[in-house]
């Protein structure tokens, strides 16, 4: 957990240091994402996968595409006034 707070601190500091130059700095903080790493961890055991998904308020694991979409949005002009934020892409886990 300390490393995650470190990323948030670095993100905020870098955002403030670079804002005047028009450089935006943000972080994406993914939750449990269904990737090959999860597959290796669960060894194909659907029970383990279900247990991981049950810990998410939305009741499922996220997808790599959902994390990528958040990152693309942060890089887009639509997020032009967003800087210094750590965007959770975690199905509501941090809101608990």
What feature does the model see in each segment?
Residues 20, 32-55:
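A glycine/serine/threonine-rich, flexible loop-to-helix segment
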Residues 3, 11:
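Active-site helix of classical SDR
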Residues 19, 24, 82-84:
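Short, small/polar-rich loop/turn modules that mediate ligand/substrate recognition or access, typified
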Residues 18-21, 33, 62, 75:
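A short hydrophobic alpha-helix cap/turn motif
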Residues 27, 50-82, 91:
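C-terminal helical subdomain
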Residues 26, 30-31, 35-36, 85, ...:
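Proline-glycine-enriched beta-turn/loop adjacent to the NAD(P) cofactor-binding site
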């Amino acid at each position: 957990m300390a490393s995650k707070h470190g990323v948030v601190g670095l993100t905020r500091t870098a955002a403030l240091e670079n804002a005047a130059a028009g450089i935006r700095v943000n972080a994406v903080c993914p939750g449990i994402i269904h990737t090959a790493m999860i597959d290796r961890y669960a060894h194909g055991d659907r029970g383990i996968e279900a247990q991981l998904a049950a810990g998410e308020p939305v009741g499922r694991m996220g997808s790599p595409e959902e994390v990528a979409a958040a990152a693309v949005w942060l890089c887009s002009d639509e997020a032009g006034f967003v800087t210094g934020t750590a965007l959770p892409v975690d199905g509501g886990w941090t809101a608990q």
